[in-house]
UniProtKB/Swiss-Prot annotation:
PROSITE patterns tied to this protein: GTP_CYCLOHYDROL_1_1, GTP_CYCLOHYDROL_1_2
Taxonomic lineage: Bacteria, Bacillati, Bacillota, Clostridia, Eubacteriales
GO MF term list: GTP binding; GTP cyclohydrolase I activity; zinc ion binding
EC number in record: 3.5.4.16
Family per similarity comment: Belongs to the GTP cyclohydrolase I family.
Record keyword Nucleotide-binding present: yes
InterPro entries: GTP-CH-I_C/QueF, GTP-CH-I_N, GTP_CycHdrlase_I, GTP_CycHdrlase_I_CS, GTP_CycHdrlase_I_dom
Gene this chain is encoded by: folE
Record Pfam families: GTP_cyclohydroI
Positions bound to Zn(2+): C75, H78, C146
UniProt protein name: GTP cyclohydrolase 1
Pathway: Cofactor biosynthesis; 7,8-dihydroneopterin triphosphate biosynthesis; 7,8-dihydroneopterin triphosphate from GTP: step 1/1
């Protein structure tokens, strides 16, 4: 990531909106934003397979669900945050992954300029491809600041996206079971 280009661009934006980039409250803002972007876009340097390669053998073909994985991401259309919860369910095919690895996989894709719809598919595809599971279902529920702060201004509205692969694609009873598990306290 080119932090110097980010700093220059932020200075230009500050000037373009009619502010003084040298005034006390703004003088260090380009540096802060460059450091922040390095952090919040760190998923661009990571690959999901780095987190999905360590598996454990099991004799289980029941649904595994990691729910309420909190995330934040940045909308690529408006450069504004969206945030919420991801629920990842899969049916093992003789192997499971450590639960933290599912959350790390979510992070890899969330820490990029993103569309929620694409992120949902990317998470599902990576789990299907690298874990070779019988099926995977990913549900993401998120609030988009571009809907809250600008445009239509509807705070509290949520977007829900779902991606299903393998056995979840054709078996509504498995999808319904995941929805019921997500509702559990």
């Amino acid at each position: 990531m080119d932090e110097n280009k980010i700093k220059d661009a932020v200075r230009m934006i500050i000037e373009a909106i009619g502010e003084n980039p040298e005034r006390e409250g703004l003088a260090e803002t380009p540096d802060r934003i460059a450091r922040m972007y390095t952090e919040i876009f760190s998923g661009l340097k990571e690959k999901p397979e780095e987190h999905l390669k360590k598996v454990f053998t099991v004799n289980n073909d029941d649904i595994v669900l990691e729910k309420d994985i909190q995330f934040y991401s940045m909308c690529e259309h408006h450069f504004m945050p969206f945030y919420g919860k991801t629920h990842v369910a899969y049916i093992p095919n003789g192997k499971v992954v450590g639960l933290s690895k599912l959350a790390r996989t979510v992070e890899v894709f969330a820490k990029r300029l993103q569309l929620q719809e694409r992120m949902t598919v990317q998470i599902a595809d990576s789990i299907m491809d690298y874990l070779k599971v019988k099926g995977v279902m990913v549900v993401i529920e998120a609030e988009h600041m571009c809907m809250t702060m600008r445009g239509i201004k509807k705070p509290g509205s949520k977007t829900v996206t779902v991606a299903t692969r393998g056995i979840f694609k054709n078996k509504i009873e498995f999808r319904n079971q995941v929805y019921e598990m997500i509702k559990m306290k």
